[in-house]
Regions:
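Nucleotide-sugar donor-binding/catalytic module of glycosyltransferases
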Residues: 1-169
Length: 169
């Protein structure tokens, strides 16, 4: 039984060559109670951000942050702060359109210069959901480098061993 919610933070910087394999390994886990945060850290290659948007659109568990380059640690911090409810999100998209990304801005303090936050239309039932967006409550947070991947049952096997652990590196 999957009672624990796992937060997965994946920093992205110029990894178009590896990113699909990484994201496929996460979204295809047998353990499905995941909240996945992708943080594009100012990638300058041609496709990293586009690949991240593609996966965000097709999986409602994914939230994508696009920010100014600041390094892997700032990208991880964005994920931690998101799960802590630090950001006030204001939607830029007024209506939900099928097969589209909903865009949000950060209101107030934005130390990591986050440009836009993206979420799939699949994560919202109606327009009212856009204004009452709530942060997921997670039990554990895991960081995965975007040029890495997980074996199929990785989380399923690891979660029972995580009691008493707050952060897994």
């Amino acid at each position: 039984m999957q009672t624990k919610t796992i937060g997965v933070v994946i920093p992205i910087y110029n990894v178009e060559k590896y990113l699909k394999e990484c994201l496929d390994s996460v979204i295809n886990q047998t353990y499905t109670n995941l909240e996945i945060i992708l943080v594009n850290d100012g990638s300058t290659d041609e496709n990293s951000l586009n690949i991240a948007k593609e996966y965000t659109l097709k999986d409602k568990r994914i939230t994508l942050f696009d920010k100014k380059n600041g390094g892997q640690s700032t990208a991880r911090n964005v994920g931690i702060e998101y799960f802590s409810g630090e950001y006030k999100l204001k939607n830029k998209t007024q209506t939900i359109k099928e097969n589209s990304l909903i865009e949000f801005n950060i209101e107030g303090n934005n130390p990591y210069e986050i440009y836009t936050v993206y979420k799939s239309y699949k994560a919202f039932n109606n327009e009212q959901d856009l204004t009452s967006f709530t942060y997921p409550i997670i039990d554990y947070i895991i960081f995965l480098d975007s040029d890495d991947y997980w074996e199929l049952n990785c989380i399923e096997e690891c979660v029972p061993r995580m009691d008493g652990v707050d952060v897994v590196w």
